[in-house]
């Protein structure tokens, strides 16, 4: 087996540019101009994609809220949707245990009743508590979020199925 083209720790890379000793002598200058330019382009693309993504996420969120109203589900939003992340809803479903809802929908829906960093804690959400939401409302609250790459129809179909479960669990 040939080892051509393999660089080991014993090989010294040759400089392309000469001058300072940044990056262990590989290149001169404090600022890696090519990397800065690349990062700038990446940020430009991310910003352009974000605007489209945010618009689509708001449409999904609005459709979910419309479905809740049409189905007559009792709910309260935790937080002002104008200031929330477009791809996340935190909703209190009156009379529905968030734990029961999570267990009943775990086959097709990834929802949570707290942050990932407190998933082993059974205490009420410290964020919702800080917002002044009563404990009984916190215990009926879930966070629904979705991300890029998930088809809108899949999100909405799963949400419709979740609404069916909510109606069955509501007291």
Q: Where in this protein do the model-derived segments appear?
A:
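Generic structural signal for well-ordered, non-membrane alpha-helical segments
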Residues: 28, 32-36, 50-61, 98, ...
């Amino acid at each position: 087996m040939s080892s051509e083209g393999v660089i080991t720790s014993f090989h010294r890379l040759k400089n392309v540019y000469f001058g300072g000793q940044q990056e262990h002598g590989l290149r001169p200058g404090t600022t890696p101009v090519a990397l800065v330019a690349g990062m700038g382009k990446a940020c430009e693309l991310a910003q352009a994609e974000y605007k489209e993504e945010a618009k689509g996420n708001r449409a999904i969120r609005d459709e979910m809220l419309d479905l809740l109203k049409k189905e007559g589900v009792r709910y309260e939003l935790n937080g002002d949707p104008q200031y929330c992340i477009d791809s996340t809803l935190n909703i209190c479903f009156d009379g529905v245990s968030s734990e029961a809802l999570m267990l009943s929908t775990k086959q097709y829906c990834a929802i949570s009743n707290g942050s990932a960093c407190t998933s082993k804690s059974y205490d009420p959400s410290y964020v919702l508590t800080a917002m002044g939401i009563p404990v009984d409302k916190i215990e009926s609250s879930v966070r629904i979020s979705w991300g890029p790459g998930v088809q809108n129809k899949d999100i909405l179909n799963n949400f419709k199925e979740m609404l069916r479960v909510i109606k069955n669990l509501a007291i």
